[in-house]
A protein has these predicted regions:
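Two-component/phosphorelay signaling modules centered on CheY-like receiver
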Residues: 11-29
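Acidic, metal-coordinating helix/loop segments flanking the phosphotransfer/catalytic sites
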Residues: 30-48
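Short amphipathic alpha-helix used as the core "switch/output" element in two-component signaling
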Residues: 39, 61-74
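Active-site residues of response regulator receiver
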Residues: 52-54
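The feature encodes the CheY-like receiver
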Residues: 56, 86, 105
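Alpha4 helix (beta4-alpha4-beta5 surface) of REC/receiver domains from two-component response regulators
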Residues: 62, 84-100, 113
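Hydrophobic/aromatic residues positioned on beta-strands within the core alpha/beta folds
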Residues: 80-81
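C-terminal output helix
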Residues: 106-115
């Protein structure tokens, strides 16, 4: 079973993602802040982490780097979620270790297609 974490201050975004992705092959957890995400990753590292590009408590690239440090040799697939295509933010996230980006708001087909493209997706 694959594990995914959505890190987003918006409870609506987290709940929509959880509703779309949760199933027999995927468990979805939620974190409302970067610090919450780090604590959860230290306890159990997910296979996929989706990081909001505009968290209030820490910049997304910093969170991405810290998750990769905690993960060690088995880092998760990491996506940054943005409300618009921001090449600068995408490049900073990729340099920090992100594998791609996800635009929000998203719908079921968009989210499922993005997850199918990930090597760990079920």
């Amino acid at each position: 079973m694959k594990r995914c974490m959505f890190v987003d201050e918006s409870s609506v975004i987290r709940k929509v993602a959880k509703r779309i992705l949760s199933g027999p092959d995927m468990v979805v957890t939620e974190a409302a802040s970067g610090q919450d995400a780090l604590e959860m990753c230290a306890f159990e590292m997910p296979d996929v982490v989706v990081v909001d590009g505009s968290l209030a408590d820490m910049p997304a690239p910093e969170l991405i780097r810290r998750i990769r440090t905690i993960a060690g040799k088995m880092p998760p697939q990491i996506l940054i979620s943005l409300v618009e295509v921001d090449i600068g933010a995408i490049m900073r996230a990729k340099r920090a270790g992100a594998h791609g980006y996800l635009l929000k708001p998203f719908n079921r087909p968009q989210l499922l297609e993005r997850f199918r493209a990930l090597p760990v997706a079920a």
